[in-house]
Swiss-Prot record:
This is Bifunctional protein GlmU. The lineage of its organism: Bacteria, Pseudomonadati, Thermodesulfobacteriota, Desulfobulbia, Desulfobulbales. Catalyzes the last two sequential reactions in the de novo biosynthetic pathway for UDP-N-acetylglucosamine (UDP-GlcNAc). The C-terminal domain catalyzes the transfer of acetyl group from acetyl coenzyme A to glucosamine-1-phosphate (GlcN-1-P) to produce N-acetylglucosamine-1-phosphate (GlcNAc-1-P), which is converted into UDP-GlcNAc by the transfer of uridine 5-monophosphate (from uridine 5-triphosphate), a reaction catalyzed by the N-terminal domain. Homotrimer. The keyword Nucleotidyltransferase applies.
Length: 339
């Protein structure tokens, strides 16, 4: 009999994110209009699971509030003892008959649902004990390196701070996403030790434990390295925001919409634009905007929850909120209107 919920999803969101140099918890920093952890959670929507567990710690109440509209189970990691310890805290929240656990980090807002679904399918099809997502980076600094044998078989992960010079030259890195058989996972976590430079319990150690116990371990190589970008600085935050904005803009342009300097334009995921419309540089469509066909929105205009009927025109630097622009109507430049 097929199980209804063979998979539990665990998202790690307890850390402080000190490199962000912010009082705001790292996973709550906005990327393309919403906290980055919401993007991670959304990427799991296509997986066969109704159990999404968020490990919280730093600013736990704020993280709970940010995800209040999502069906999540929250587990508190009282002490920050490492990623293995974080996953261990989720044990009681996972049903005993659950077969697999997928573990993600709350600071990877670019991860695609397609990659997660492909990884999970491969994990199940190949009857693997552990499937690890990896990728190749030109500059692998700050990432754990993948150590393989001469045949290319995955052996272990070495964290940056524990890597020797030869290991640091390795370009294949740990993307921080795992799919693990539940029964093996919690046996292995009990064996993880903190004998490393950080004195922490590393989740990465389960790879070495799986190999040594002759479990089936495989990698899923992420096709797009930027998809697994971990946001650890304001620079990476800006990069992630730009990438999601451009993904959205490419999607819109493919429907027959023209854009001037698309890298400067922000179109919310809830907004719709008809074909043969022209969007100027620096335009922002916030909330739920409905733009008809043959519309024109000039440079720097900001529309929030607005409707533009076909053939209408909004002038440069106008700011409209909750407005309806009638067919063929033109709103002059620099107008401020709210309804």
């Amino acid at each position: 009999m097929k199980k209804e919920n063979p998979l539990a999803i665990v998202i790690l969101a307890a850390g402080k994110g000190t490199r962000m140099k912010s009082e705001l918890a790292k996973v709550l920093h906005p990327v393309f209009g919403r906290p980055m952890i919401q993007h991670v959670l959304a990427s799991t929507a296509g997986l066969p699971s109704d159990k999404r567990i968020i490990i919280i710690g730093h600013q736990r109440h704020a993280v709970r509030e940010a995800l209040a509209d999502d069906a999540c189970t929250f587990v508190v990691q009282e002490e920050q003892l490492g990623t293995a310890h974080a996953v261990l805290t989720a044990k009681e929240a996972i049903a005993d008959d659950c077969e697999d656990v997928m573990i993600l980090c709350g600071d990877t807002p670019l991860i695609s649902g397609q990659s997660l679904e492909e990884m999970y399918d491969r994990h199940r099809t190949n009857s693997a004990t552990v499937t690890l997502m990896t990728t190749q980076l030109g500059d692998p600094t700050n990432y754990g390196r993948i150590i393989s044998d001469n045949a290319g078989n995955l052996l272990r992960i070495v964290e940056e701070k524990d890597a020797d010079p030869a290991e640091k030259r390795i370009k294949e890195i740990n993307a921080g996403i795992y799919c693990v058989r539940r029964d093996f996972l919690y046996r292995a976590l009990q064996k993880v030790e903190n004998n490393n430079s950080q004195g922490e319990l590393y989740l990465t150690d389960i790879i070495d434990l799986a190999v040594k116990s002759e479990q089936k371990v495989q990698r899923y190589l992420a096709p797009e390295p930027k998809d697994v970008l971990g946001v650890n600085s304001r620079i990476e935050l800006a990069m992630a925001d730009e990438e999601l904005r451009m993904r959205r803009n490419r999607e819109v342009m493919l429907t027959g919409v023209s854009m001037i300097l698309p890298a400067t334009i922000m179109i919310s995921s809830q907004s719709e634009i008809g074909f043969d419309s022209l969007v100027g540089a620096g335009v922002e469509l916030r909330g739920h905007c409905q733009i008809g066909s043959n519309c024109k929105i000039d440079t720097g205009a900001i529309l929030t929850n607005c409707k533009m009927e076909s053939g209408s025109h909004v002038g440069a630097y106008s700011v409209l909120t909750g407005c309806t622009v009638a067919a063929d109507e033109k709103i002059p430049a620099q107008q401020r209107e709210e309804e």
